[in-house]
Amino acid sequence: MMKSDEGVSGNSNNNNNYKFKDNTFRKYGVEVVAYDNNNNNNNNNNNNDDNNTVTVNSRGFHISIHPFSFRNKLTINQNNGSIGGSSSSSSTSNSVSTPKPQSFYVDDAGIAKQLNQSVFDILSRSRYLSSLSHENLAEFIAAEPSQKHHDQMLIVSEDYKNSLEKQIEIQAKRQTPIPSNTIGRYAYQILKALSYLHSQDLTHRSLSLDNIKLDDNNQIKLTNYGLYYLSDHGENVSFPIGNLLYLSPESILRGAKGSSNTKADVWALGCILLHICLGYCIWQDNNPSIVTNRILHLSGYSTTQSFNSISKSFEQCELKKTIINEKQHEEYEEYDDDEDISEEEKEKRIKDIKLNNRDNMNNFINSLKREEKENSDSNSGSSNSNIGIGLNGLGKELIEIIEQCLIPNPMDRPDSETLLDHPYFNEYKNIDPYQLQWIIKPFTKSWDLPDSLESLTLKEIESYGHIGSDNNGGGGGGGGESDSDIYSGKEIYYFWKLLGGNIEKELVNKGFAKASPSVHKLPLYVPVKASLTESTNSGLNSPQPYQHQHHQHQHQHQHPNIIKSKNSTVYNNEFCLVELSNVFLKIKESFKLYGSKVFEEGIEQSNNNNNNRFNNIENNIELQIIIIREFHKLLYQYQYDDPTLSQPKIYRLAKLFVPPILRGDIWSSILGVNEREAKQLYNSINLDVKGPNDKQFELDIPRCHQYHPLLSSRQGHVQLFKILKAWSLLNLEKGCYWQGLDNVASPFLVHHFFNEPIAFASLKAFVDKYLSILYVPNNHAALSEIMLIYQQLLAYHDPELLNHLMDIQLDPNLYSIPWFITVFAHILPIDKLEILWDSILLCPSSLPNFIAASMIIQFRDSILKMNFEDGITMMSMIPSVDVHKCVSDALSMFNKTPLSTTVTKFVSNTDQELWWMQEVPFEKRKLELFPRIDIHDLINDQQKVILDIRTPLQFQQIHYPSSINVNPKLSKLQQQMEQYKGQQIVVIAPKDQGVDFTNQLIQWKFPFVSMLNGGMDSLEHGAHSLLIISNKN
């Protein structure tokens, strides 16, 4: 039996849990607390599972899969001519205007070519829903297109087994009504969730008892709040959205596809509260038309249903004209005579006028009160008298709230925020752990401390210090160091898929995916030929389904005949619950296996290459769970603490593995993006002004990664345009926009969809780090330098491939400029680009040169057999590159290559004696196929073969230890050099000499060949003590 004081005291014990959540990256989800019981006893046996206590508090958390079918929008051009039949030229001569194309929403199955725009738009809207976060909302996890039915979408969300509907059924069986204060708490939490949704410009529209779930702590979780928004207010589906019992009168009057405002949810809340109080819905009936008539009757309309205040029931009656008062009549006449208002808007306003009559609703509420009072006095009544507590069992304030919710006219009905400010809810706000009790001053003050610190006693200070220490550990017990975290629904779903979960298979296994007969896949609208129109229509017993017959006859030669079939798809609110016990068990095992100390030690060993324990992380779910836990800690510190302390740790952990579920947050932290500063900068840019590159953006965006569902959606185009425009306006002094910036911005937009400030700030930081020298009005010199470095690196690692490219005259300028000017974003799909950028963001800015070299080396066997034309064609195959191998090879090449090969070695205003540091004309440097290195790389690596091509006399006077004196003019030099092939070779040559010899080694296909910049002169200047000098004068 439910306690009567549950609604008041139910949340009071959760304050400490909420404090634990204050220090976690995620605020809502599955809570995990783990702590070492023997930590205070200095027990160093951290690998003993018996020393760790792990608790997974799921509160009944489940994942639900909700399939629904959508429709595509088909536009039919009404061209003059023979469409579906013959036409005469005279029939069009009297045409006043060319008919406009008409759009119809149709099922995919009847269309030969699959239409994807509806899918893309639905997926883009789903990303907005997945960004919502509230304690009383079930998390919207994802919307995924079905792999089996291209007109079906699968909604994945947080869910629970218990609901208000089931709770009422349980209370009815026990003959125990839900207490008044519990109903009040339900109303408060539902209103909190609705208020949050409405503040995000979202309408639930489908609020009902079965969509209001209860977790194991009896806290409200609203579900299925995204369908109305996903379906473009019902336009993309062939079924009406919403439970008829709780549908507002204005929604009924505007039709199934009419857009509902947020106050429709307030009406639904009033209906639900009344349902809970009575224990049943008083206007419920198996006939939908009767239900709508009863609701409209209570809203002031004259219908075939009326409420008998004596029998306290609805009954059939004759339809009478709706009575309106004199003021309403004047408004009615005003709208009816106004020619400036459209017919649709005029009809809507007239309907709203009729909703101003509250008499029926007031009589209805008062009758229910009187009935309950009479029943209580006589201790008798209807069979439903013991199911609900009744209106008289509620306080006056809660009854007032219900009455305000059920005001027929939405203009007079209060919104959710206004209702939430009702004095009745103050009691619940005071004990609400999520209610912000004060404004934090200063910004860095602890959430645990009160606003006034002057009057704190020593005991209070110690108590707050104790809470703070618990928070840092996550609320563990026993005083031991704890590892606590909260995993969001998206992360739980990610773990479930790593464990082999598949939503399509889950639906099949549980009987939710059933094969439909082919007739059920017929489209709602099909174009038919005129010769078939008569025979088709003659077989129909119903009137013409599309427009009036005379209208259709009038335009029969201007557009195709449209036959509307019966709605083949009816909304099914069934959903498939996914069992997650295996996921929770794996989380417990992971926390026991990898405590923080054990994990830190593992990282150190992995970085030192002493342990292979952390290899193959992609297939190791235990490690991924812990890595995400550690990232949660670091990302929280980065956002709310000192980012300079957490950023290096994020770097180190990201080198181990970047979880796809956190990639956007990790990238922005690596790039040094601060959320508050990003919003300030982005909001300071006036995007309303006309920009110099707006036209170019409009041309580029529709061609940018249009295979990607988010980037090809309408919302994706809008957001990408705004981000590019913001960057352009911020960089007006550069005076140019380089095509390809849209490709660079795309990955950041994908990971920060509906968060334009962070996407923009990430783009800005990325461009500043990797592309600042290229995105300038004159970037010829910078591009030429990059091309030369790339060519020299290719010669260093694969001279045979470079020689062949030079032989067929396939210059890097012909194929690789888009690689570098977009950091490969132009040529690679987003999924491969993400893997590439995971490494690029963690390494020096020279890594793209190595990636470019490794990318083309991957196709070397094919390229070596090609001529120029085939080679150009081959470059179009680069997107098929194995990106994992490319990154691995690039990092291997990077580690084998002297660092100074990619570093500029010239300094302006250099002393003439330091000739090797003076700038060399680029045309002269272009002749060098090899890279140059500095003396630091020569000294630090003793494994190099050093070839000194100075004269024997010069070599005898002074030379570098272990160097070999070689005569570059020997006739059998190539045979002599073969013994050094495959080793790192450094050439020491006199000033202005050695280029031909070093180039010759490259042409002989010697890899790892470089020249010491400055030769012996640089060694005498910087490493004189290391040289061997002859004693002879």
UniProtKB/Swiss-Prot annotation:
Protein's UniProt name: TBC domain-containing protein kinase-like protein
Q: Which residues form the Protein kinase domain?
A: 72-425
Q: Which species is listed as the source?
A: Dictyostelium discoideum
Which terms in the Gene Ontology molecular function aspect does this entry carry?
Answer: ATP binding; GTPase activator activity; protein kinase activity
Q: Where is the composition biased (Polar residues)?
A: 535-546
The gene it comes from is tbck
Q: Which residues bind ATP?
A: 78-86, 113
Q: Does the keyword Zinc apply?
A: no
Keywords assigned by UniProt?
ATP-binding, Nucleotide-binding
* Keyword Cytoplasm set for record: no
Specify residue ranges for compositional bias: Basic residues.
Answer: 548-558
The record's CDD domains line, in alphabetical order, gives: PKc
